[in-house]
Amino acid sequence: MTWDIKAGCMGKPERVAAAYLLSHFPDIDLDIETYLEERNRLQDEMWPTVKLLPGVKKLVQHLKKHNIPIAIATGSRRSKYILKTSHHPDVFDCFEGKVVCSDDKEYVSRGKPHPDIFLAAARELLKRDVGVPDAEPTEAHALERSRGLVIEDALTGMQAGKRAGMKVLWVPDANLLNVAYEGAEVADKTIKTLDEFVPEEWGLPPYDLEA
């Protein structure tokens, strides 16, 4: 699988991503259900061993310390989210359960790159008056949306964040930078890892000076 194909899978609901992936391999005798069953079996064995990416723990704990409202909006199903995160309680407990997953149908009907999941996280979890998808935002809604900062690694997530009217910091795998992209949405800033994150650039309290 090339990174062009992987980029088209990242951030999307699993069945949508699976259909996209398999469409590139028409000669393989594999349907979506069989593929997902085997993929999920292998992934479920690996998720509890996944390590945090550089800078994540420092940033999340910093935001929590300063009472900055934070939430997670993920394209993963809730069962997968739990598998991915339960071995890192020192980080994910900071979100206090404020998590929207792709199968939370009371909030999300469309996956990324649609803006629904980010607007739902802001509206339902952080209680921000950001309006709803597909409705023209009022001036107040637009202003409130612009105060949000989305941190994403997926191209579809970056698009969703911008379509939600929010600022977007893109932290992609280096290989994604070589993928052809013709979309209208562009991240406000791109960095290699969250170790490069400077809170003050986004109106946030600076990191404490290290002893």
Regions found by a protein language model. Give the residues of each.
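Hydrophobic/aromatic residues within well-ordered alpha-helical segments
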Residues: 10-14, 35-39, 77, 91
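Conserved phosphoryl-transfer catalytic core
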Residues: 1-8, 19-25
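Short beta->alpha linker loops
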Residues: 9-13, 51-55, 76, 113, ...
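Helix-loop "lid/cap" segments that line or gate small-molecule binding pockets
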Residues: 13-28, 84-85, 121-125
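Asp-based, Mg2+/Mn2+-dependent phosphohydrolase catalytic module
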Residues: 61, 78-211
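Metal-dependent phosphoesterase signature
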Residues: 22-61, 66, 130-142
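Short phosphate-binding/catalytic loops that engage adenosine nucleotides
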Residues: 67-68, 166
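A general structural signal for well-ordered alpha-helical segments in protein cores
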Residues: 14-18, 36, 56, 81, ...
